[in-house]
């Protein structure tokens, strides 16, 4: 059932990927096996009637350098959600930034994140719902 029907049954896939004070990154989608099983995970959504999903590609993977974007880890999952008719609530940045950026306190964060958000919107124009940060 599409969100514009007046009702949606939503869930989210935990996609935190913070860098700890030790410098070690903890990627929750990696830890729970989602990268290896995303097709199965998305199939389970459909099997229980979920029609909206808070989901986003890992910002640190898709924005590997200033003005450089790598959508290779995002394209197939995003397209599969679209094919399943699941409304994506795009989680653009969830508890972590690319290593080159340094952190949320970096004065350049808003500029680089804005660039990423623009590129995401151009790449996936069918996504209309967002949780930016």
Task: Give a label for each model feature.
Residues 18, 44-133:
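Substrate-binding cleft and catalytic face of glycoside hydrolase catalytic domains
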Residues 1-50:
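N-terminal carbohydrate-binding accessory modules
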């Amino acid at each position: 059932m599409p969100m514009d029907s007046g009702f949606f049954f939503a869930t989210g896939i935990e996609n935190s990927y913070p860098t700890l004070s030790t410098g070690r990154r903890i990627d929750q989608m990696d830890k729970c096996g989602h990268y290896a099983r995303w097709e199965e995970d998305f199939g389970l959504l459909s099997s229980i009637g979920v029609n909206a999903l808070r989901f986003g590609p890992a910002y640190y993977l898709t924005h590997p350098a200033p003005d450089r974007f790598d959508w290779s880890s995002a394209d197939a999952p995003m397209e599969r959600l679209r094919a399943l008719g699941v409304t994506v609530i795009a989680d653009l940045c969830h508890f972590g930034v690319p290593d080159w950026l340094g952190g949320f306190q970096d004065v350049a964060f808003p500029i680089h994140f804005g660039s990423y958000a623009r590129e995401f919107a151009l790449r996936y124009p069918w996504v209309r719902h967002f949780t930016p940060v």
